[in-house]
């Protein structure tokens, strides 16, 4: 951590320039602790996102890092994985401190750290305003290895000497632009002054206004700068249809009738639960249809094999849960069937959207029961799109 007041380097506001472009494109090649790797795969990650491919390694190696990335790019897991790799679970003391602008975000980050660190026997405490100070103090005295919190409460706990900083290796500021614009500048500067000089600093921000750049110049040493543009998903070029299915029980027959059409090309069929994925796979297999299935309960090695077969084209139909919608690189898939409409509308675009640059054409077919009509209308409104009744000649469109 640098602490100098030299003149601000001339960095244009708004966007940083990357000075680092090394990419590590699989978690296996990051040389992570086996129990951390296990946690990453159990959490449902398959391969690192763009920011994870670029930022995890420099953080692990000890560089100060500035990453400019929007939410939805996988940044929480980026710094969670890095922090978990760097801490010593046997040392009962705070070794990584993560600051977030809101209590909700802090709690969300805590959940991710706990989930990914599931096999590591460590503690992660959320140190946030609005909770009982005494309980907070007690939890911090137990020496959780990772503390995530909001600036006000964290500063208070460090000043009371309850949150000890002598073993602190890593200080992470998430959504730095938000924190500074919410008036936490003074608290953040105070926290910096209270940390050991040797603390490594990682700063994440969607935008780079002047006040964020000032923090980077004052408190960071030769930072690695990484800019990750969010790839916009689009529904353009995708023909979206629905089939009215009166009852849930009729979906299976509807899908069987469609099977010939489906296998002209490769298709992904989405269900809302792992249980449903298994059930549907069993039912279709019993009817002599060839399908493969994938969800988060499976061992990573098993999922890799299934994905490989699907990518190579040797399996044609893949049944999956939402967990994998974000992880499946299905650019080659031209047909997606929502056996169940997604439980939340944001997932709709992850299931059927395409990276705009590829401009892939595709067809999406939604099975809609009477109970689903409202959700379908919501999806149409949310994306300003039209989902029309499926025509008879759908095979010609795929």
Swiss-Prot record:
Q: What protein am I looking at? A: ATP-dependent RNA helicase eIF4A
Lineage, top ranks: Eukaryota, Fungi, Dikarya, Ascomycota, Pezizomycotina
* A Pfam family per the record: Helicase_C
Q: Which residues bind ATP?
A: 69-76
Group of enzyme by EC: hydrolase
Q: Which InterPro entries match?
A: DEAD/DEAH_box_helicase_dom (IPR011545), EIF4A_DEADc (IPR044728), Helicase_ATP-bd (IPR014001), Helicase_C-like (IPR001650), P-loop_NTPase (IPR027417), RNA-helicase_DEAD-box_CS (IPR000629), RNA_helicase_DEAD_Q_motif (IPR014014)
Where the record annotates domain Helicase ATP-binding, the positions are 56-226
Q: Cite the record's note on assembly.
A: Component of the eIF4F complex, which composition varies with external and internal environmental conditions. It is composed of at least eIF4A, eIF4E and eIF4G.
Q: Write out the GO cellular component annotations.
A: cytoplasm
Q: Which family does it belong to?
A: Belongs to the DEAD box helicase family. eIF4A subfamily.
Organism encoding this protein = Aspergillus clavatus (strain ATCC 1007 / CBS 513.65 / DSM 816 / NCTC 3887 / NRRL 1 / QM 1276 / 107)
């Amino acid at each position: 951590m640098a602490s100098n007041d030299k003149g601000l380097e001339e960095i244009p506001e708004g966007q940083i320039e990357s000075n680092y472009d090394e990419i590590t494109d699989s978690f296996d090649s990051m040389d992570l602790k086996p129990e951390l790797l296990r946690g990453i795969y159990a959490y449902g990650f398959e391969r690192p996102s763009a920011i994870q491919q670029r930022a995890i390694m420099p953080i692990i190696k000890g560089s100060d890092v500035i990453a400019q990335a929007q939410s939805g790019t996988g940044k929480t897991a980026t710094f969670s994985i890095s922090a978990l790799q760097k801490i010593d679970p046997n040392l009962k003391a705070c070794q990584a401190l993560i600051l977030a602008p809101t209590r909700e975000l802090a709690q969300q980050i805590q959940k991710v750290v706990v989930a990914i660190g599931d096999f590591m026997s460590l503690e992660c405490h959320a140190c946030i305003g609005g909770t009982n100070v005494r309980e907070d103090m007690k939890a911090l005295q137990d020496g959780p290895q990772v503390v995530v919190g909001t600036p006000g409460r964290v500063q208070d706990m460090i000043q009371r000497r309850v949150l000890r900083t002598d073993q602190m290796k890593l200080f992470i500021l998430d959504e730095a632009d938000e924190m500074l614009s919410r008036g936490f500048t003074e608290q953040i500067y105070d926290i910096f002054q209270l940390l050991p000089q040797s603390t490594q600093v990682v700063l994440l921000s969607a935008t780079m206004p002047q006040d964020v750049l000032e923090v980077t110049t004052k408190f960071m040493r030769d930072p690695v700068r990484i800019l990750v543009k969010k790839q916009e998903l689009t529904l353009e070029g995708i023909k979206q249809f629905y089939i009215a299915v009166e009852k849930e029980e009729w979906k299976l027959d509807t899908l069987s009738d469609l099977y010939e059409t489906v296998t002209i090309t490769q298709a992904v069929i989405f269900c809302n639960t792992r249980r449903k994925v298994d059930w549907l796979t069993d039912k279709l297999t019993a009817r002599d249809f060839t399908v493969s299935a994938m969800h988060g309960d499976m061992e990573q090695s098993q999922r890799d094999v299934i994905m490989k077969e699907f990518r190579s084209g040797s399996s044609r139909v893949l049944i999956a849960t939402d967990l994998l919608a974000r992880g499946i690189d299905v650019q080659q898939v031209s047909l997606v069937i929502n056996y169940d409409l997604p439980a939340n509308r944001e997932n709709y675009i992850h299931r059927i959207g395409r990276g705009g640059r590829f401009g892939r054409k595709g067809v999406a077919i939604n099975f809609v029961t009477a109970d689903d009509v409202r959700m379908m209308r919501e999806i149409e409104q949310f994306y300003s799109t039209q989902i029309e009744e499926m025509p008879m000649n759908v095979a010609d469109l795929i």
